[in-house]
Amino acid sequence: MKRSKSLGFLFVLLIGSVAVYSISSQNQKKSENTKSSAEGLIPSILLDNMGEEVSSDQLAGKYVGLYFSASWCGPCLSFTPELIRFREQHADNFEVVLVGGDGTPQDQAKYVKKYKMPWLSMVNQSKSAKQASQKLEVQYIPYLVILDPSGKVISKDGVKQVRSLKGKAMQAWKSMPKDA
C-alpha cells in the first residue's frame, strides 16, 4: 500500500514537473518572439511616393514609423497631415513607411498622391505588409509603430504620442530605454 502511494506521488510529481517545464518553455518562446518582433518588419524593397522601387537601406540610422493607414479611414485622413508635418520637422532622423490598407495598389497610389505623402510605402497588400500587420497585432487604423535606429519596436502608441507631444515625441522616443 505504501509503495503504491509512493509511486502515485512520484507520478504526480513527474507530471507536475513536465507541466511546469512546458509552461516555462512557452513563456521563454513568447519572450524571445517579443524581443525579435522587429526583425523582418521592413522588406528590402519599398516604393517611393512616385511608385518607384527603392531600397530600404535609406532607412539606416533613422527612427522609423510604420504607418498603418488607408484612404477610406476618416481618422487616418485627419492624422496624415499631422504626421506629414511631424516628419518634415524631423526628416534628418525620422522616416515613415506606409503600410496601406487600401483594396488595390492603385487606391494606395491615389491616397499617397492626394495627400502628398513624402515617405516610402510597402507594396499594397503584399506578403510583407500583411506579415508586419500580423506580427505587430494591428487591430485598428491609424496605427503608428515606432522603431529605433536598430529596428527595435519602442512604441506602438505613435499616433497618440505625435498628437499629444507634438515635436517632443521624437525626444521621448530617443530617451526610451534601449533594453525595454
Roles of regions detected by a PLM:
Residues 1-45, 180:
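N-terminal targeting signals for export/organelle localization
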Residues 43-64:
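A short beta-strand-turn-helix
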Residues 62-64, 69-72, 140:
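Short pre-active-site segment immediately N-terminal to redox-active cysteine/selenocysteine motifs
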Residues 68-85:
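Conserved redox-active cysteine motifs that mediate thiol-disulfide chemistry
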Residues 78, 85-91, 113-117, 149-152:
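Sec-exported extracytoplasmic/periplasmic mature domains
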Residues 97-99:
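Short beta-strand segments
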Residues 103-140, 145-150:
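Thioredoxin-like thiol-disulfide oxidoreductase module
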Residues 146-180:
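Thiol-/selenol-based redox modules, centered on thioredoxin-like
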